[in-house]
């Protein structure tokens, strides 16, 4: 994550660093947050006020931590509270803790005048006080794991796919307290829900594409599916939008532009070498696209 004069990098357990963007000097590093990422780290850091917030959902340890962004010192650390209920007959976690890991990046929202850090882990979505790490509420979905998407917020609700296995898209009222599983889920859908690509909230509608190439438009307030159409290809990268169009990036290298409307319409398609696994970065009017073989900057001239 980048701000004026600084860039913050994390590789998960291998380390976290802060660099000066002008001098390239390393201002501080941390390598003492340890967990078994199992298949590698996937959660990005975020900034909130003077804090750099990190997520560690490993097979062995699961926690969220906040560092002072100026010094790298720990401000708070909070362990995940869900009971995974995944022990085998020998008292060991199933598949070495495979169901305990996660890859989601959190989001800070303002709801009812209160800041909440919305963080999706294995089997649960949590809300924390971003300044102290105190858990505010939790929604548990025990049959899902390896959540990879970032939540979105609007219309007084948090929207997020729950992860792999029996993944669903949930709409949650973030005004709860404690275990809110039975009280604060407003709607859910199981049809063509993405596991890896994050969802977009554009006005009154949620747009998403599942890993197998089915794109959907869903009414945010009700959960009613407006349309669901096969775009084709396989997907790991998250879509982006300019407010009028939604752009999907396939593992085969195809970019598909779809109208961000209630009626499904493909507006354009293009092809790049390699294929997309990483989500695009947007800088001013340009896209920074990383395929398996190339790094591209694309903008309108």
Could you tell me what each predicted segment is?
Residues 1-301:
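Noncatalytic, solvent-exposed loop/strand surfaces
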């Amino acid at each position: 994550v980048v701000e004026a004069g600084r860039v913050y990098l994390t590789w998960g357990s291998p380390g976290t660093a802060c660099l000066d963007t002008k001098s390239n000097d390393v201002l501080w590093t941390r390598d003492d947050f340890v967990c078994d990422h199992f298949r590698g780290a996937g959660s990005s850091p975020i900034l909130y006020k003077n804090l750099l917030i990190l997520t560690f959902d490993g097979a062995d340890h699961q926690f969220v931590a906040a560092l002072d962004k100026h010094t790298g010192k720990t401000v708070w650390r909070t362990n995940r509270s869900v009971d995974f209920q995944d022990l085998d007959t020998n008292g060991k976690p199933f598949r070495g803790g495979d169901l305990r890991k996660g890859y989601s990046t959190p989001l800070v929202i303002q709801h009812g005048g209160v800041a909440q850090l919305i963080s999706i882990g294995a089997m649960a979505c949590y809300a924390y006080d971003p300044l102290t790490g105190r858990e505010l509420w939790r929604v548990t979905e025990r049959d899902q794991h390896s959540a990879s998407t970032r939540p979105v917020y609007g219309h007084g609700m948090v929207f997020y796919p729950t992860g792999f296995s029996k993944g669903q898209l949930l709409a949650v009222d973030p005004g709860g307290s404690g275990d809110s599983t039975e009280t604060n889920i407003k709607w859910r859908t199981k049809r063509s829900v993405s596991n890896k690509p994050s969802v977009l909230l554009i006005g009154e509608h949620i747009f998403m594409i599942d890993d197998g190439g089915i794109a959907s438009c869903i009414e945010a307030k009700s959960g009613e599916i407006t349309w669901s159409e096969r775009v084709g290809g396989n997907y790991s990268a998250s879509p982006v939008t300019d407010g009028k169009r939604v752009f999907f990036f396939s593992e085969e290298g195809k970019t598909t532009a779809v109208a961000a409307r209630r009626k499904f319409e493909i507006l354009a398609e293009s092809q790049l070498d390699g294929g997309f696994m990483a989500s695009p970065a947007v800088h001013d009017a340009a896209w920074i696209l990383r395929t398996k073989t190339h790094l591209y900057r694309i903008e309108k001239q």
